[in-house]
A protein has these predicted regions:
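Short histidine/acidic/glycine/proline-rich micro-motifs that form metal-
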Residues: 24, 55-60, 134-137, 186-189
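Structural preference for beta-strand elements that scaffold enzyme active sites
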Residues: 13-17, 49-50, 80-86, 126-130, ...
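Active-site groove signature of glycoside hydrolases
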Residues: 119-137
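N-terminal binding-site loop/beta-alpha segment at the start of enzyme catalytic domains
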Residues: 1-82, 322
Length: 336
């Protein structure tokens, strides 16, 4: 397996990680536990060393289900893998169906309670990479970073990061406690966070790309006939999965198909290889429940594009019509 180092840290991870959210959250009913255990064990055997979860990736009945399953499945391989999890948000009215608004809460006492819960559920004495899941505008970045510094000194976390950060927030937090990685949405259909690349390079911060296949649509395994449960699967409401979007994205899909033919690869592999060819510190974390997709995704690490090819792809992307893409759950501000 090919490895990458996140920024200037000493944290080495597999060039492609595994986003575990969809195993139990947002993509239909949770997968069968035995299937998840098998999938994660196979991922380790294939060379995956980087696994991403969060304290809220569960169900209304068990909001911490994802961490529990990831912790159990990876316990036999704990010294071989890097586990990333997240703190700092809760769902508004999680008992209701559909995509729930998020309530940020990064007060120090909340963070400390969260880290203890995650350590217990993940069956570990330390978290390799601990992300602030969403920015809490009621808590200054310096306060969050200071809490992270304390947790690092206590050995409860080894590195920390920020998900969906801005440049100003990253700079302020990094000044207090160096940030190892940011985790933001990034794909051929969602390139707005490329604006962070210069500051990531300057500060030596890695970039972890979530939804690198635009919630699966760039795998080109779906079409206008694909159906999703509106009660349990966020894709039912995502703009890129609406019928008119498939027509709007036709040129994009055709370009990816052509690149796949040229590289003797799949559309998903092309999408992942494109971003990995941009910077050596970009690590995508696509999710899947299928062993075949698991193997396919990690195979993207063996495919590369030259910088001229990357520039040509970027130019084409900028010139073509592309549908909107799901940009994340709505954030609501509630008094703490």
């Amino acid at each position: 397996m090919i490895f990458r180092t996140l920024g200037k840290s000493n944290l080495q991870v597999s060039a492609v990680g595994l986003g575990c959210m969809g195993l139990s959250h947002a993509y239909g009913a949770p997968a069968d536990k035995e299937d998840i255990m098998t999938l994660l064990a196979n991922a380790v055997d294939m060379g995956y060393t980087f696994f991403d979860t969060a304290e809220i990736y569960g169900t209304p009945d068990n909001p911490h289900l994802n961490e529990e399953m990831v912790g159990e499945a990876l316990a036999p391989y704990r010294n071989k893998v890097v586990i990333a999890t997240k703190f700092g948000i809760r769902f508004d009215h999680p008992e209701l169906p559909g995509n729930h608004p998020l309530i940020p809460d990064s007060r120090p006492e909340i963070i400390r309670a969260a880290v203890e819960g995650s350590l217990r559920r993940l069956r570990t004495d330390h978290i390799d990479l601990y992300y602030q899941h969403r920015i809490d505008k009621n808590v200054e970045p310096e306060v969050v970073a200071d809490t992270m510094s304390e947790l690092i000194k206590e050995g409860k976390i080894l590195h920390w990061g920020i998900s969906e950060t801005t440049e100003q927030y990253l700079r302020r937090a990094h000044e207090v406690c160096p940030v190892t990685a940011v985790q933001n949405r990034y794909s051929m259909m969602a390139r707005w966070h490329e604006s962070l690349f210069p500051v990531c390079k300057e500060l030596g911060v890695g970039f972890v790309a979530f939804s690198p296949l635009a919630n699966g649509v760039l795998s080109e395994c779906y079409n206008t006939e694909s159906k999703f449960d509106a009660q349990t699967d966020y894709r039912a409401a995502m703009p890129q999965y609406q019928k008119d979007s498939f027509e709007k994205n036709k040129c994009l899909f055709e370009m990816i198909e052509q690149l796949a033919m040229e590289k003797h690869a799949t559309p998903a592999q092309v999408s992942l290889a494109w971003m990995m060819s941009k910077k050596p510190w970009i690590v995508p974390i696509p999710g899947t429940r299928c062993l075949c997709r698991l193997k396919e995704n990690i195979g993207a690490a063996d495919i590369s594009f030259s910088q001229d090819e990357v520039m040509a792809i970027d130019k084409a992307l900028s010139s073509m019509g592309i549908s909107d893409v799901f940009g994340g759950s709505r954030i609501v501000d509630k008094a703490q």
